Amino acid sequence: MDSKYSNDHLFGEFNSSFKALQWHSYEVQGLESNNNVTLLGSSPSTKYQIFKYKNHAYGIQFHIEIKDNTVSQWGCVPEYKKALEDSLGKDALKKFDVKAQENMKLMNFNAENLYKNFKKIL
């Protein structure tokens, strides 16, 4: 998160850096010339990780919601497992699950805050 957007309605209370689940490498691109789009956060793999259009819509290119079986369930889909291994190598599913478990409490905390903030702007 870019700290200059600390007053944002959804993400203003988030730390400037936080953990989230990103499974694939698909991403929104080419928004640089759109003056109505504000980039709120990036990651090493995805420039437009969090963005918003005016004050009407947000784009979030990751999963902030996660359960203890999310990675194992998604890993049952052959295409998903292959995509993960193509990006992160052999045994990626197991390593990814370990990291998800390690960060689950914080990710769930952030998911709850995002939901609370979203309800405030409705």
Where are the model-predicted features located?
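Acyltransferase
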Residues: 64-122
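Pocket-forming structural segment of enzyme catalytic cores
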Residues: 1-69
